[in-house]
């Protein structure tokens, strides 16, 4: 996002919760986060840091780093989280796994090692009074509070996922056409939302999900 003073004022005035898509240090981030001309977007995020700080100071809300772990950057997961916390001062890092592509067992094993490093880092910073919030830990806590039931994320109710092509999805775990609920030009489609709410269509990504019975 290219910030303007008006846009920044609106975010602060209405205390809109803000997430910044950033996957780590410059080389890691620019590997997947590119503009249409092929250039990476990391420098643009850094240019907006002064706006981020003012937003947090005035709203008393922390900006979240939306950190996506993919097949070509999972080996840098630990270093990326450290960079976001220590160098860019994010207090909330929402790490999520790219579920669009099928992962191999070896890749998942490697990711598990990185996940463990981040968890140890999370615990260590808590002990020394420099805690940050890490998305996977928050998700596990909420999952336990709901007695193992899902639905706490409020997909389609309090959050949506917008792809770079403008299509809107209710759940980041279903980015197939069956999960599309509208687009930025025409808005949300109530027909599509109602169809997803019924969850009656067989063979869709949603119907195959083992948590869909509790999905909001």
Label each PLM-derived region with a short phrase.
Residues 153-157:
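Short, small/polar residue-rich loop motifs at catalytic or cofactor-binding pockets
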Residues 2, 25, 70-72, 99-102, ...:
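Short, solvent-exposed loop/turn segments at secondary-structure junctions
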Residues 113-144, 168, 172-216:
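C-terminal accessory region of radical SAM enzymes
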Residues 1-97:
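Radical SAM/AdoMet-radical enzyme domain recognition
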Residues 27-32, 91-111, 132-147, 175-180:
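Flexible glycine/acidic-rich beta-alpha junction loops that bind and position SAM and/or redox cofactors
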């Amino acid at each position: 996002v290219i910030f303007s003073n008006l846009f920044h004022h609106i975010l602060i005035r209405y205390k809109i919760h803000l997430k910044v898509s950033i996957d780590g240090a410059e080389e890691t981030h620019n590997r997947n986060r590119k503009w249409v001309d092929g250039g990476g977007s990391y420098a643009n995020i850094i240019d907006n840091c002064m706006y981020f700080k003012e937003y947090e100071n005035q709203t008393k809300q922390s900006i979240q780093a939306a950190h996506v772990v993919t097949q070509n950057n999972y080996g840098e997961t630990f270093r990326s989280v450290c960079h976001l916390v220590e160098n860019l001062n994010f207090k909330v890092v929402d790490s999520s796994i790219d579920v669009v592509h099928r992962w191999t067992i070896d890749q998942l094993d490697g990711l598990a090692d990185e996940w463990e490093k981040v968890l140890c880092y999370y615990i260590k910073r808590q002990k020394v009074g420099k805690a940050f919030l890490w998305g996977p830990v928050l998700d596990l806590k909420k999952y336990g509070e709901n007695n193992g039931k899902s639905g706490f994320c409020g997909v389609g109710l309090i959050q949506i996922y917008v792809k770079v092509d403008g299509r809107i999805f209710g759940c980041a775990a279903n980015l197939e056409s069956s999960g599309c609920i509208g687009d930025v030009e025409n808005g949300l489609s109530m027909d599509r939302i109602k169809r997803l709410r019924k969850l009656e269509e067989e063979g869709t990504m949603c119907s195959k999900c083992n948590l869909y019975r509790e999905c909001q």
